[in-house]
Amino acid sequence: MLILTRRIGETLMVGDEVTVTVLGVKGNQVRIGVNAPKEIAVHREEIYQRIQREKQEQGEPGNS
């Protein structure tokens, strides 16, 4: 895992087309903005896991 330190307003690049910008810090919460092409899905981890779980459940035999 790469660990980076950024200040509010600073950005990091993921590949050539994705940017992640620190928008604010309040207590133990960090607000970030992600700019990515439409074809790249961006989700919070818990949402991504739910999507994957739902896909898996739909693919199981006996589920309609």
Curated annotation (Swiss-Prot):
Per UniProt, the keywords (alphabetical) are: Activator, Cytoplasm, Repressor, RNA-binding, Translation regulation
Q: Which InterPro entries match?
A: CsrA, CsrA_sf
Q: What GO terms describe the biological role, i.e. biological process, of this protein?
A: mRNA catabolic process; negative regulation of translational initiation; positive regulation of translational initiation; regulation of carbohydrate metabolic process
Q: Does the keyword Cytoplasm apply?
A: yes
Q: Which Pfam families match?
A: CsrA
SUPFAM superfamilies under this entry? CsrA-like
State its location(s): Cytoplasm
| Main localization category | cytoplasm
Gene Ontology cellular-component annotations: cytosol
GO MF, one annotated term? mRNA 5'-UTR binding
Function of the protein = A key translational regulator that binds mRNA to regulate translation initiation and/or mRNA stability. Mediates global changes in gene expression, shifting from rapid growth to stress survival by linking envelope stress, the stringent response and the catabolite repression systems. Usually binds in the 5'-UTR; binding at or near the Shine-Dalgarno sequence prevents ribosome-binding, repressing translation, binding elsewhere in the 5'-UTR can activate translation and/or stabilize the mRNA. Its function is antagonized by small RNA(s).
NCBIfam families tied to this protein = csrA, PRK01712.1
Q: Which family does it belong to?
A: Belongs to the CsrA/RsmA family.
Q: Which HAMAP family match?
A: CsrA
Quaternary structure and partners? Homodimer; the beta-strands of each monomer intercalate to form a hydrophobic core, while the alpha-helices form wings that extend away from the core.
What protein am I looking at?
Answer: Translational regulator CsrA
